[in-house]
Amino acid sequence: IIMANREIPYKIYLEENELPRQWYNVRADMKNKPAPLLNPATHQPCTLEELSHVFCTELAKQELDDTTPYIDIPQEIIDFYKMYRPAPLVRAYCLEKALGTPAKIYYKFEGNNTSGSHKLNSAIAQAYYAKKQGLKGVTTETGAGQWGTALSMACAYLGLDCKVFMVKCSYEQKPFRREVMRTYGANVTPSPSMETEVGKKINAEFPGTTGSLGCAISEAVECATTHEGYRYVLGSVLSQVLLHQTVSGLETKTACEKYGIKPDMIIGCAGGGSNLGGLISPFMGEKLRGEADYEFIAVEPASCPSLTRGVYAYDFCDTGAVCPLAKMYTLGSTFIPSANHAGGLRYHGMSSVLSQLYHDGYMTARSVEQTSVFAAAEQFARTEGILPAPESSHAIRVAIDEAMKCKETGEEKTILFGLTGTGYFDMVAYQKFNDHEMSDYIPTDEELKVSMDRMPKVD
């Protein structure tokens, strides 16, 4: 039932029975499929058997499937989703008023769960397939800690062991998030650690390093492959993660259709691409099939600008070069970004699905500096009453910028962005901003060249 003429409420909640029953696989509608993952030793496309050494078998199948458009969500996962979904689609009336813009601003809020973000959507799926396979546990990496928290929640629910390698600078900046993980039974180690061979190697090569997501991934993969009954799971980048995250985009699309809302532009922050891919996929599918047109904008930190300044090439997904090679926009897997305050976006590469779509001109990208991001975060907090995560605030920055352009031109554009989570554990970052101690670090071309020159040569 379309209620196009009805007054649009501040928050649109779908009914429980309107929860998506299937995930949407955007690769099925892509003419140019993402390039395959390659075996790091042979440079040949990874087989199901090879991927199954690292990932759960069912997840490895999802990773390789670029033809099935819809994949059924198991009932057990739907039951878990019901604890915190459907998530609201919010009309930012208060922000619109404060900006004095004719634009209509909407955001999909994914912070309604203890992990504080969208990450739980894929954590429960990956933990479910691990449990179904009869595994003892899983290993993973986490940056700011949202993914680690989400996975520890899912593992606690299903009775699985959970081993988390947390990027050292976040481990130190965000002790409370570490404790939430431990409350859910996870074992949390700062990365790089002395528990793995790759951790020892990185510590020796970069003494005193604050770590990176790429480095934590290497440790988690090594830990999984050297312990019987364990597999590695991860919170972003891979196609399987973007697939699970489409639950958010599908809900958003249903809510929009229900109220006759047609977004002109859809904006999301992008680190590895899980939130952006999940939010835009169902809309991107329409664009790929020629049924509708939307403007898609990926927003990344200026300190880690993979889409806007990276190269499109095969690269390692991790610093230790143990993961498969992925063709993506990358700064080079040895690139260690400055210890900026959006830990969840400090990744050198980008999902191969989003990289392909960006390469083919279906979406655009912008990089923003962190002081401008926190200015947008505070404006949003003061008008909309939600304290946003630093990661999400990258999308808020561009949404506000676009709304202000509408104010100048008088256009009544409909702007939709993903509010991926809350910022309650990011108070060190907010404190730095409030104390005027936050700086904007932008890597030089020379610095980027160093890590790009060290990338693998793949014919």
Can you annotate each of these PLM segments?
Residues 109-120, 138-147, 238, 267-272, ...:
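Active-site nucleophile and cofactor-binding loops and adjacent substrate-binding regions
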Residues 270-278, 370-436:
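Claisen-condensing/thiolase-fold acyl-transfer catalytic domains that form or cleave C-C bonds
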Residues 70-72, 202-240, 248, 260, ...:
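Active-site/ligand-binding loops adjacent to catalytic centers
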Residues 139, 147-210, 306-316, 427-435:
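Active-site-proximal loop->helix
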Residues 125-135, 149-161, 182-183, 280-290, ...:
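Alpha-helix C-terminal capping segments
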Residues 5-135:
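Positively charged, low-complexity intrinsically disordered leader regions
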Residues 122, 130-169, 262-276, 296, ...:
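A short, small-residue-rich loop immediately preceding and capping a beta-strand
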